[in-house]
Amino acid sequence: MAYTGIDHFIARMRFRAAYPHIRPGSRVCDLGCGLEAAFLDYASDRIGMGVGLDDQVADGMQGRWQRVRGDLRSPLPFPDGNFDHVVMLAVLEHLTEPEKVLSEAYRVIASQGSLILTWPSAMVDPILNTLHALHLISDEMESDEHQKRIPVEALQQMLQRIGFQKFLHRRFEVGLNNLMVAFR
């Protein structure tokens, strides 16, 4: 099923939550960027250099952005400290080994850089299942595609073990989604 208008609306809400945390002129890696690397386009006025990595994209340039076909279960194909920000919007809930992926994200973030995450709260699952049953959202938005939920406190502890120092967390979309910014 192709992305629907509701899918795009929900994605834009995530983009709006993440956007203020991108420093102007920064180097950004969007892990799990999707076919269109849409967040890089959305935040283009703040991004000096952008790379989108996803297992569904073809390697090459997409406008100003480099697309890299890659699997998040493998080591990231980037040098240590290469990015000011790593963005993972609605990706965490799909990972079977989140600590491994988050450790790799930490490795490629420069000193004073940040990891910007969004993920849905458990309250959203019945809503997603209903929207999916009505064919109003794509298959990958359905809650059956999601792994075990990580509570905010457990995620923060995991990120501290990895090496992140400071955290900003807030809920958005009337509490149905979370934003966390973790700083190196």
Locate the predicted segments by residue.
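Feature marks short, surface-exposed loop/turn motifs that line or immediately flank catalytic pockets
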Residues: 59, 112, 123-125
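A short glycine-rich, Lys/Arg-flanked "PGG" loop and its adjoining helix->strand segment in the class I
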Residues: 99-111
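Histidine-centered divalent metal-coordination motifs
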Residues: 94
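A structural motif corresponding to the C-terminal end of an alpha-helix
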Residues: 158-164
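Short glycine-centered segments of the SAM/dcSAM-binding site in methyltransferase folds
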Residues: 27, 112-114
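Conserved class I S-adenosyl-L-methionine
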Residues: 116-138
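Conserved N-terminal segment of class I S-adenosyl-L-methionine
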Residues: 1-79, 85, 102, 142-148, ...
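A short beta-strand submotif of the Rossmann-like class I SAM-dependent methyltransferase core
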Residues: 88-91
